[in-house]
Structure formats: C-alpha cells, structure tokens
Amino acid sequence: MAFPKMRLMYVCLLVLGALCVYFSMYSLNLFKEQSFVYKKDGNFLKLPDTDCRQTPPFLVLLVTSSHRQLAERMAIRQTWGKERTVKGKQLKTFFLLGTTSSAAETKEVDQESQRHGDIIQKDFLDVYYNLTLKTMMGIEWVHRFCPQAAFVMKTDSDMFINVDYLTELLLKKNRTTRFFTGFLKLNEFPIRQPFSKWFVSKSEYPWDRYPPFCSGTGYVFSGDVASQVYNVSESVPYIKLEDVFVGLCLERLNIRLEELHSQPTFFPGGLRFSVCRFRRIVACHFIKPRTLLDYWQ
C-alpha cells in the first residue's frame, strides 16, 4: 500500500512542478512584454491648467500616480500638494499618469483632470515597468512648459512631503544650478533574480554596479537639471528602473548628488510618526491617504 501512495505523491509533485515552471515562464514573458514594447515618446494627452511664465513657481512637485489612486491624489490635494505660498515662494503640484484599457477609469480621470487641472498624461500603458516613461514625461513637461521653476521634486502617491521644511532647506542651501538631492544610494547592484520586482537582465543593464542615484520615492533638483536630463536622455541606455535611469543621465552630465542636510531628511523605508519628528523631515514613504490626512491636522 505504501508504494502506490508514494508513486501517487511523486506524480502529484511532478505535475505541481510542471505547473510552477509553466506559470513562471508565462509571468516572465509577460514581464518582458511590459518592459520593452510600450511607446517611449508621443504627444501629451493632458496638460495642466497653469502658466509658469506669468507666475514662475519656486517648487514644482511631480507625483507619479495611477488611475486607481484617486483617494491618494485627493488626500495630497488637501495636504502637502495644495497650491500655496511658503515663505513667499509659490508651490505647485501635478500628477503623472499613463493610459489604461479601462474605459470607466479613463472617463473618471478625464473628469478629474477637467475639475482640478493638475494632471499630466501621455500615451503609454500605466504599469510599474513603464515608470521611467512616466518620470521622463514629467521632466519633459518641466523642460517644455515650466523651465522657470527654481526647483522640481519627483515623488510618489504614498508619500508624506513636508513642503515647508523642504522650502526652508532649499532657501538655506542656496544652490540654483546643477543641484540634485534625495536619499542617496551610492553603492547599489543590479538584482538578477528573475522573480524580483526590481529584476534587471544582463541584456538590459550589462554592468555589475549602478551609478550613484537617489531613491525614486522622492528626489529634488534645480530647474536647469530637468532640461539637461531631458536633452541627454536619448543617448543613455534605457532601463525600466526610473531612479537608476535618472542616475545614468546624471552620470553622463557629471552632476554629483548632494546631501540636503547634515541630518537624514528622506525616509524611503518609512518612519514612526511623531509631530516633533515630522517637522524636521522632508519625505516619508508608505503613507496611506487616511493617515496622511490625520498627520496633516
């Protein structure tokens, strides 16, 4: 009796193993399709209702978002992303989106864009592996439509940004050209495990180490850097990790990363909340919309 049971178990394990291999290869092929087939350029589908020539902003915040993150966008609009003046300096926030195959989501974003006038959109599928396209879209928008901005911050929808403290530090820093700061990553290596979210193949990036770059959760740069990165980007090998791609552009431009403050101010790994502590940080990751609204009170 033991032998038939063992044989049945062996057959089941073989079938299970074969299924795992099949679905793994399917996922990998899907990953490859999403990584490399979508458009890298194109016309803007949506542009924000703003004129930087008449009222040049001190700080433009570019927030990567997706169609389903309406709650996140609304929370940001009510908190740190609200257009206002800090220390006499004007701040403006815009949301970066791609396209979706959902007609309902497309219609909702169309209505949202008409209502708020703060969405930037191009014709590429809005998936994680197109984040470089999304970020470069925002940088292109600054280059073409808002080069008057003194500073630009690229960040994500699940972030707490202390725009008051950031403005204070930028004014103290007094660096208006070739400036780039954030959470510095100076000794990072490509992840070669195929099932990692951050997997990069040898064909996509053949080198064994990344150039210095800042965490994509939030980095800040002087307005002139937007045009420099945009202009050099066509000569830089494309990689789907947007923060690494921007780092490659900075390396080509010989722009060195700098610390914003002697103490840590960017927290891509999150941070336990306290009123006193959050008054002296710039960016904190993993913040849900309801939490953001509570923190802002």
Curated annotation (Swiss-Prot):
The keyword Oxidoreductase does not apply. InterPro entries: Glyco_trans_31. Residues 29-297 are lumenal. Residues 1-7 are cytoplasmic. The chain crosses the membrane at residues 8-28. It is found in: Golgi apparatus membrane. This is Beta-1,3-galactosyltransferase 5. It comes from Pan troglodytes (Chimpanzee).
